[in-house]
Amino acid sequence: MQAIDLAYRAMKPIAVAALIVGLGMPFSAYSETAAPKCDAPLHLLRLANPLTHFAQKLATRGPITIVAIGSSSTAGAGASSPATNYPNRLAEELKRLFPTHSITVLNRGVNGEEVDDMLKRFDKDVVVAKPDLVLWQLGTNSVIRDQMFTDHGAAIRDGLKRIRTIDADVVLIDPQFAPKVIVKPEVGPMVELIATTAKQEDVDLFRRFDVMKRWRDDDHMAFESFVSPDGLHMNDWSYACMAKGLSLAIAEAAQRPVMSAKATSHMVP
């Protein structure tokens, strides 16, 4: 499987076909010490659908608002500081990719929450912000508490329905691949349920579980390299690598309508 370096160089304008094909800024820019290579296969990064609302704001050069809602993975548990959680890293990555655009990423993560908890605050934490893109991280806490969704994804669909009322793009983010998650028998069904719901509802999915699983299975990274000492949460390196991959996926999906057929054929494995 072809893998790509998730580093990149600034582009004016961004060449969409190059976004997910080895760009040039080394990940070690984030650290004074040697760090593992941040990479992922094309098929794990590429979002299924174009981000049309994000694309419209790019075209009109209007300010772009992104809401990242979720639990501790969004809040930043395991990060050494708020600056190194994934939403703040994502804001940095998108500003490098789109230096002439105003892009704001709002962190609406709350430790320990499940989908029903998030839905209770959707109005004040998502709807009021009038975002162009919603990143919804979900599923992990239900897995580690041995509480598989019994509604067959109805709660997720409820959230997606509410996001549609504000004309925002949405990307679901599935659980992390970490020791305290993968020991749970519910993790496989949860990852599958989120993927199935995303496909049925025609929304995008960032496959965090599979990206992190690849670090372990294919890159042979020790869990300590990308999981915090608690065995559950991500660390500075993995939050930054996740943000880098997600930024490239967002940028490509937001510009996909202008891609040529030739460029598309080279990007799809």
Name each model feature, range by range.
Residues M1-V67, G76-S80, K95-H101, A129, ...:
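N-terminal secretory targeting modules
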Residues V67-G70, I173:
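Short hydrophobic segments within beta-strands
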Residues I69-S71, L138-G139:
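Short loop/turn segments at strand-loop or loop-helix junctions that form parts
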Residues S72, G109:
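Catalytic nucleophile serine of serine hydrolases
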Residues T74-G78, V115-D116:
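Short, solvent-exposed loop/turn elements at domain surfaces
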Residues A75, N85, I103-L106:
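Extracytoplasmic small-molecule ligand-binding "clamshell" domains
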Residues N88-T104, E113-V268:
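Alpha-helical cap/lid subdomain in secreted, periplasmic
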